[in-house]
């Protein structure tokens, strides 16, 4: 265990990614068919061990992504290169996940229409994304795309091939509920999660973020940087 997890434990803090992974652990049943939309090279980039456990639990794990990165995802049984309209199966998947994908979607109605088409009755959809009115999304929305990679590389060591244009058309509770309920889904849960990872590269800055969060939470306030974790169910 490195210094990052130790510091987060000291402040009783779990990252949004932890909650996202936990929601999959809770909802993915043995022999379920799992579709990961926008999965890229890794299902869980920072927890490959858990990703391997969960893909072993599923009967089939399928990925779809317009980036050729998906062809390098070793845990997938099958992969579709393209958007969700490329997915051939209908009424098939028991679990559909979108990890940090919603912010890139240019046509939410088209996306959710295909999610409804490919999801099985009683199936769940988990959306993990950034909240539109957090500082980072506001800054990225106001700056040109060519300027996005440098700060991501500095703060999170992100590779340029993992930086994509952003839209932020389904990044609030209202936007997500409107589009999913329109296509017949039921909202099972929705939470905002404090995201104290912007400065997690350094010990001092991580301590600072978590101290600010602790202070704000004492007054029942959120940390400024927020993520969304929403779960929807098809009747």
Predicted regions, residues:
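Short, Lys/Arg-enriched, disordered terminal segments
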Residues: 1, 234-235
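Conserved N-terminal segment of class I S-adenosyl-L-methionine
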Residues: 1-95, 195, 210, 224-228
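Glycine-rich nucleotide phosphate-binding loop and flanking beta-alpha elements
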Residues: 41, 68-70, 104, 108, ...
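Residues marking the start of alpha-helices
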Residues: 84-85, 89, 101, 164-167
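A short beta-strand submotif of the Rossmann-like class I SAM-dependent methyltransferase core
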Residues: 95-101
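S-adenosyl-L-methionine-dependent methyltransferase catalytic module, highlighting the catalytic core
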Residues: 106-118, 124-233
């Amino acid at each position: 265990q490195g210094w990052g997890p130790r510091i987060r434990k000291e402040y009783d803090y779990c990252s949004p990614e932890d909650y996202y992974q936990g929601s999959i652990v809770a909802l993915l049943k043995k022999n379920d068919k799992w579709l990961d939309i926008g999965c890229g090279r890794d299902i869980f980039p920072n927890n490959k061990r858990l990703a391997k456990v969960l893909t072993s639990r599923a009967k089939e794990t399928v990925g779809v992504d317009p980036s050729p990165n998906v062809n390098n995802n070793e845990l997938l049984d099958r992969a579709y290169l393209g958007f969700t309209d490329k997915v051939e199966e209908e009424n098939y998947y028991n679990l559909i996940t979108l990890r940090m994908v919603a912010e890139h979607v240019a046509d939410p109605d088209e996306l959710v229409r295909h999610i409804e088409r490919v999801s099985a009755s009683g199936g769940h959809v988990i959306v993990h994304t950034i909240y539109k009115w957090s500082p980072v999304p506001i800054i990225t929305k106001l700056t040109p795309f060519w300027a996005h990679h440098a700060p991501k590389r500095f703060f999170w060591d992100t590779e340029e091939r993992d930086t994509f244009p952003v839209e932020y058309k389904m990044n609030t509770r209202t936007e997500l509920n409107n589009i999913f309920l329109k296509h017949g889904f039921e909202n099972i849960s929705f939470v905002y999660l404090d995201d104290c990872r912007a400065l997690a590269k350094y010990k001092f800055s991580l301590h600072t973020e978590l101290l600010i969060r602790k202070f704000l939470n004492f007054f029942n306030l959120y940390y400024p940087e927020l993520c969304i974790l929403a779960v929807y169910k098809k009747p």
